Amino acid sequence: MSIRAEEISALIKQQIENYQSEIEVSDVGTVIQVGDGIARAHGLDNVMAGELVEFSNGVMGLAQNLEENNVGIIILGPYTEIREGDEVRRTGRIMQVPVGKELIGRVVNPLGQPVDGLGPINTTNTRPIESPAPGVMDRKSVHEPLQTGIKAIDALVPIGRGQRELIIGDRQTGKTAVALDTIINQKDEDMICIYVAIGQKESTVRNVVETLRKHGALEYTIVVTASASQPAPLLYLAPYAGVTMGEEFMYNGKHVLVVYDDLSKQAAAYRELSLLLRRPPGREAYPGDVFYLHSRLLERAAKLSDARGGGSLTALPFIETQAGDVSAYIPTNVISITDGQIFLQSDLFFSGVRPAIDAGTSVSRVGGSAQIKAMSKVSGTLRLDLASYRELEAFAQFGSDLDKATQAKLNRGARTVEVLKQGLHKPLRVEKQVIILYALTRGFLDDIPVVDITRFEEEFHAWLDSNATDLLEEIRTTKKLADDDKFAAAINGFKKVFVASE
C-alpha cells in the first residue's frame, strides 16, 4: 500500500488550517519597593482597584493604591520572601473567601484557611469579600427578637435579628463575655454564629474556642481569627471575611449572628496600612475613609424581606474605649453607624455589678419592636427605676432622714441591681427572665433581704423547673404574660419554702 504525496500534503494543510495558537497574555509588573506588609510595583497599568495579584513566590496581594507610575499592594501573607525586582502578575480576580456549612465548627484565618489542625475544609463555594449591602427594598424592619440570655440586655436594651448593636467599653470590662454568653444562648434557636477575633492574643482565642466547645456552641459557630502576630492586612480583612461567610447563610434564608471583637484594632491596622501607602492622615492620624471602612461592613447586616428569603444577619461590633472616652473618633463613628450601643462601665465592673451595663447610656434604637410582649410589660419601668435609684443613691449618702417613698425607691433599686447581676456563661431562657423580673417589678422581692436576692433567684429557677413547668411553657409559646394570679401563686408558693439568711 503506497501513500501518495498529495494525501500527506492535504492532511498537513488541514492540520495547519485547524491549528489555533493559545497564547496566554497576562499583565506582569516588577516590585520596586517592599516592606511592612506593603509592596509597590511598576508595570501593572491595567490592574483594577481591589484586584488580587500574585508574587513570584506564590504569595497573594491586593491592589489598593492605583498611582500614576506604580501600584500600592497590601501583601496577604509573609512578605519577608519578596524582594525588589521580583515579578508580580495580575490574576483578573477580586478577593474571595470560601463559604458554606463546611466551615461551621472550624477555626479559620481571614483567607478561609483552617488554623485548628483538623484538616482541610471541603468546600468549593466562594463569595467576593467586598459585596454591596442589601438595598432598601430588599430589607424588612427588625421584628424578631435575638435573645442574648442576659437579663440586663434582654430587658433594657433588647436586640432584634438584623440589628447592629455596638458593645463599647474599656478593656477588661467583660465585652467578650457578653458576646460569648449570647452565642451560647443560641443553642436551640437555629442560629449560625460567627466570632471574628481581630488582633487578639492567640491564647485568648484558644480560650474562646474551648469555652464554646465546652458549652456545645462550637457546633453552630465559625471562628475567624487574625491574631496580634499576623500582618496588618489580615487584621484589616478579618471582619469582611466574617460577614461574607455569614451572608452565604443569610441569602439562603437562615439567621446569622456575627461578633467583631474588636473594630478598634481593625481601624488601627487600616491606619497603619494607609500611612504606609502614603495616604494623607486626618483626625487622630486615621485616613479620611475610616468611616466608610466600618459603614460598608456594618451596612451588610440586615433583616431581608420575605421575597429575598427572610434571612437575617445581626452584627455585634466591639469598640474599646480609653478611660471611658466615648467621644473619641472611632467610638463616635461606630455609634453613629449602629442601631444602638451597650456601654460597659469599668466602675460598675469593679464594684461587682456584672455584666457592667450602664443603663443610662445604653440604648437600643430598633430592638423595642422585636421584644416579646411579656418582656416589654415586665421591663417597662426598669430603666426609670434604675435611673432614679442611681440619682437617689448619691443623695442618700449625705443624710439618713429619708421619707418612706424615697426609702422604698432605694430598697427597690438595690434589689433591681442585684437581680440584673448574672454569672459568667450562665445565660437564662427568656421565660425565666420574665418571671423573676415580674417578681421584682411587682414588689414580691421587697421583703427579701438584698444579700439573699441572688440565692433566691437561683433556687426559684430550680423550683420553677420542677413545680411550674406549665407556666414556663405558656410564656415560651404565647410570648405573653400569664394571669397575675398564676404568677402570684408561683412566686408566693416558692417564698413559703425559701429560708432567708439571718
Curated annotation (Swiss-Prot):
The record marks 362 as: Required for activity. It is a peripheral membrane protein. Its EC number is 7.1.2.2. Residues 115-135 are annotated as: Disordered. It comes from the Bacteria. ATP binds at residues 169-176. It is found in: Cell membrane. InterPro entries: ATP_synth_asu-like_sf, ATP_synth_asu_C, ATP_synth_asu_C_sf, ATP_synth_F1_a_nt-bd_dom, ATP_synth_F1_asu, ATPase_a/bsu_AS, ATPase_F1/V1/A1_a/bsu_N, ATPase_F1/V1/A1_a/bsu_N_sf. It catalyses: ATP + H2O + 4 H(+)(in) = ADP + phosphate + 5 H(+)(out). Keywords: ATP synthesis, ATP-binding, Cell membrane, CF(1), Hydrogen ion transport, Ion transport, Membrane, Nucleotide-binding, Translocase, Transport. It holds the Pfam family ATP-synt_ab_C. GO terms for cellular component: plasma membrane; proton-transporting ATP synthase complex. GO terms for molecular function: ADP binding; ATP binding; proton-transporting ATP synthase activity, rotational mechanism. Its main location: membrane. HAMAP family: ATP_synth_alpha_bact (MF_01346). F-type ATPases have 2 components, CF(1) - the catalytic core - and CF(0) - the membrane proton channel. CF(1) has five subunits: alpha(3), beta(3), gamma(1), delta(1), epsilon(1). CF(0) has three main subunits: a(1), b(2) and c(9-12). The alpha and beta chains form an alternating ring which encloses part of the gamma chain. CF(1) is attached to CF(0) by a central stalk formed by the gamma and epsilon chains, while a peripheral stalk is formed by the delta and b chains. Belongs to the ATPase alpha/beta chains family. Produces ATP from ADP in the presence of a proton gradient across the membrane. The alpha chain is a regulatory subunit. PANTHER family: ATP SYNTHASE SUBUNIT ALPHA, MITOCHONDRIAL. This is ATP synthase subunit alpha.
